[in-house]
Amino acid sequence: MIRSILCCRPVRQFHSSFLSLNSASPALNAGIAIDAWLKRGTAKSNIKNRKKYDHHHNGENRRRKKPMAVRWSSGTERAKEAANHMLSKVFETNSKGNIRFFNQISGKVEDSNIREFAKGIDLSQHGINIVNIINTETEQLPFVKLVDTKTALKKYSDYLAEKKEEELKSMGLLPRKFFENSKTNEDNLKHIKISWSIKEDDLAKQKAHDITSMLKKGNKVNLYIADKEDLGGSKWMENFENVEEEKPPSKKRLRPSEIERRESIIEQLKLLVSDISTDPIIEGRANGKMIIRLTPKVNKDDSIDKRSLKELKKQQRIEKLNKKLQRKKERELQDD
């Protein structure tokens, strides 16, 4: 039995295993050595085969998960980076690249694939943004929206800034003042809820006071206008995430008089902030939900007055210096 096994294996490899055993019982030791050598050979072959299997199947997984590249033919390098960043976010959410978007031509929310959606996008005019994540029964779908290039680049710059901040924070290179300033910038945006059912007296007094006082302090203000049920709860802001694409419920048709009243509220708000805010950015519809974004207006007269005062002081210093020089010359002439 031992002889037949030895004939099937290289003698040199077996000999080293055999000699390492105790020579007290040659037959027993020979059997143990052969058994150990066979097991070792089997383990090596198993590891080798396992590596081949893992390499083959991991390669398949990598090929399967690799998203199809989109070649951009327009836009700056920065715009392309911003678009590719959004593509990667889409594939992180949905490995197949499936998305949901609002079709402005049909006026409907439709499902598609990011590869198809990205075709023909002019990055010099538009960019891509993910405004929400939709959970279906089978998968998660990023809700994608076309935005202007400026907005897309701003969002990408914010992402890079946050990423850099996290890196510096982890390295302990950011001073405390930086965090305080960041918190101040976040607190600079104020949110005010307004119900469509608000009374004119409340709008003209309490809400008007809240809005104007915040703008005068230099705060940006977002006005969220909707029915009361959309303004309640701790997560009420989620109701305004897709306010541009959202269509009002077909069952809920408002009377013309109600539409007119709501439009009157909007006009009152615009008139209220006309002197202290830049042109409001209005999103949504009067028969649904709306967001009015307000930015405090920089008082040009104040800045002009400050510059004038600075120039006046500078001129006064020059005149004072000239007088000193003149007096010095006069004294020198008198001494001569």
Curated annotation (Swiss-Prot):
Cell compartments where the protein resides: Mitochondrion
Keyword Mitochondrion tagged: yes
Top-level lineage group: Eukaryota
Region (Disordered), start-end ranges: 47-67
GO biological process assignments: mitochondrial translational initiation
UniProt keyword annotations, A-Z: Mitochondrion, Transit peptide
GO cellular component term of the entry, any: mitochondrion
GO MF annotation terms: mitochondrial ribosome binding
Transit peptide: 1-41
Family per similarity comment: Belongs to the AIM23 family.
Protein name: Altered inheritance of mitochondria protein 23, mitochondrial
Species per Swiss-Prot/TrEMBL record: Candida glabrata (strain ATCC 2001 / BCRC 20586 / JCM 3761 / NBRC 0622 / NRRL Y-65 / CBS 138) (Yeast)
